[in-house]
């Protein structure tokens, strides 16, 4: 999700993507729950602080083909004396390299565009393109998301395209449990990165547990490494795959095997 740390509440969807897409006919429903224990405490550019805020995002992803899916996000925020508030929505189509190409790594590309209310993000309309590369090797897993982001309305428009790399490596401790480390950065414009103190640098030790082929679970505790980053947060992702749509199978007309006619 596109984030510009000086002017918006982030932490709505904290995830390093793998290259796989949702299979055709399946719908993935995920709940992202992120609580900031120690974050920003003052209003900046009209944006509410995120300290002690619970950000919850519903992500619905539909698989259409073996290489194409579409995701839709509904962002919400809950804070002391504020109650639940709608933050905004994003849409995210994604394509991937089919398995039949036999590439040595998984590769996909997503693009995401959407709106967030001004009290949650001074940059209300944003866009992102995210290349995704991953690899499973025995018990080890690695994923890299070198995302490029752009604001279309708000104070970050003059910055142009910014660079936000995400990275994850994990090790399968058991057949069900893997432990890993996730990194999330927002480094500034591609034409010249911000000073380190103004960059967003967050490191999240995380756990993934396999409850079954239709489930997804991720939990992590994030620590900010710079003053422009929330200092302490907890994130959790719970996902479930459903079959709401049955893919149409083309009919194959068999040749007439009868030997006679009139």
Predicted regions mapped to residue ranges:
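Transmembrane beta-barrel domains of Gram-negative outer membranes and organellar outer membranes
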Residues: 7-262
């Amino acid at each position: 999700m596109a984030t510009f740390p000086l002017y918006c509440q982030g932490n709505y969807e904290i995830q390093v993507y793998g290259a796989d897409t949702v299979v055709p006919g399946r719908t993935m429903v995920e709940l992202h729950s992120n609580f900031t224990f120690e974050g920003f405490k003052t209003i900046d550019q009209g944006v509410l602080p995120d300290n002690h805020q619970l950000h919850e995002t519903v992500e619905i992803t539909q698989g259409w083909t073996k290489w194409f899916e579409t995701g839709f996000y509904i962002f919400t925020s809950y804070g002391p004396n504020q109650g639940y508030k709608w933050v905004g929505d994003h849409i995210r189509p994604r394509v991937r390299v089919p398995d039949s190409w036999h590439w040595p790594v998984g590769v996909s590309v997503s693009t995401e565009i959407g709106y967030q209310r001004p009290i949650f993000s001074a940059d209300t309309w944003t866009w992102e393109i995210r290349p995704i590369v991953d690899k499973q090797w025995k018990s080890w897993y690695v994923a890299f998301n070198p995302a490029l982001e752009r604001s279309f309305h708000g104070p970050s428009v003059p910055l142009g395209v910014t660079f936000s790399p995400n990275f994850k490596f994990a090790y399968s401790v058991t057949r069900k449990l893997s432990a890993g480390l996730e990194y999330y950065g927002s480094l500034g414009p591609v034409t010249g990165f911000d000073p380190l103190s103004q960059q967003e640098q967050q490191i999240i030790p995380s756990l993934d547990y396999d409850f079954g082929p239709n489930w997804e679970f991720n939990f992590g505790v994030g620590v900010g490494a710079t003053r422009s980053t929330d200092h302490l947060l907890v994130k959790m992702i719970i996902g479930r795959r459903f079959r709401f749509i049955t893919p149409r199978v083309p009919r194959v007309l068999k040749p007439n095997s009868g030997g006679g006619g009139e």
